From Swiss-Prot:
Subcellular location, record wording: Nucleus
Free-text comment on this protein's domains from its UniProt entry: The 9aaTAD motif is a transactivation domain present in a large number of yeast and animal transcription factors.
Ranges for region Disordered: 1-23, 229-254
Record-level GO cellular component terms: nucleus
UniProt cross-references to Pfam families, sorted A to Z: HMG_box, SOXp
InterPro entries attached to this UniProt entry: HMG_box_dom, HMG_box_dom_sf, SOX_fam, SRY-related_HMG-box_TF-like
Tissues and organs where the protein is expressed, per its UniProt entry: First expressed in the embryonic neural plate shortly before closure and expression continues in the neural tube. From stage 16 onwards, expressed throughout the CNS including the brain, with expression predominant in the undifferentiated cells of the neural epithelium. Also expressed at a low level in the retina and the gut epithelium.
Species this chain originates from: Gallus gallus (Chicken)
Superkingdom to which the source organism belongs: Eukaryota
Described purpose of this protein according to its UniProt entry: Transcription factor that may function as a switch in neuronal development. Keeps neural cells undifferentiated by counteracting the activity of proneural proteins and suppresses neuronal differentiation.
Motif (9aaTAD): 263-274
The entry's DNA-binding region: 46-114
Protein name as annotated: Transcription factor SOX-3
Any one Gene Ontology molecular-function term assigned to this protein's record: DNA-binding transcription activator activity, RNA polymerase II-specific
Amino acid sequence: MYSMLETEIKTPQPTRAARGEPARAATAKVGGAAAADGCRSDQDRVKRPMNAFMVWSRGQRRKMAQENPKMHNSEISKRLGADWKLLSDAEKRPFIDEAKRLRAVHMKEYPDYKYRPRRKTKTLLKKDKYSLPGNLWPPGSAGAAAVGVGQRIDTYAHMNGWTNGAYSLMQDQLGYGQHPGMNSPQLQQMHRYDMPGLQYSPMMSTAQTYMNAGLHLQHVPRPYGQQPSTAMSLGSMGSVVKSEPSSAPPAITSHSQRACLGELRDMISMYLGPGGDATHPSALQGSRLHSVHQHYQSAGTRVNGTVPLTHI
């Protein structure tokens, strides 16, 4: 009985290496079968029949590779394509006939053949998809990051339509109509942000008239030292007219322009007086304010809701 127990204890157990050998052998068998299936699938894959260019370039490629052993295959293909285009139809004819014969043989051998193009790799799209913004690149690759970000910005700008002329393209995309007069050559020479200033051309001309009158009156001798105050009043008038709000001003007709010119002559004669006689300064100031106030009431213009020039 003890001898039987000793023999059972002494029986060698299968080692780990022995247990792993069948598994390793099975894995090798599966791998070999997969490799054999891959080779068999490559062998079973039917190639397309050669066209005329392939028939011609078969010998030319070998010859060019022997002459230029360091030349890449893509460069050889480019040169062969350029040489093939330079051949005449008479020179291409035998290769075209050979390609037709090979196609007929291919159709006889594989009547059920159907061309299945291989799927192209999308490496370029993956690179652009997983590219980092400019501020997330490491310091060593700042130049490459700047180039990549610039290319992506140009791409997205082109997709969205926001190129260098973003303002004009935005107007075209949103469908905003333009006035036919906006396409005149005079307006095209001006900047687009200066367009609101064109609406005030009559008022600015009136202000220019007053300013020119102020310059003219500076050279005329005035009594009682009224020259500085007159220049100051006209200068303030020009500044008030220039700082008017952006609302549309009333239309100034030729009648109102003639009235303004008449008032301007009255103001000049008021300073000079009849026969060059001087009047009292307070009377001159009161009449000047009255005439200016009457002019603004007739023109219908109010500056910031207050009567202009009341501070003088």
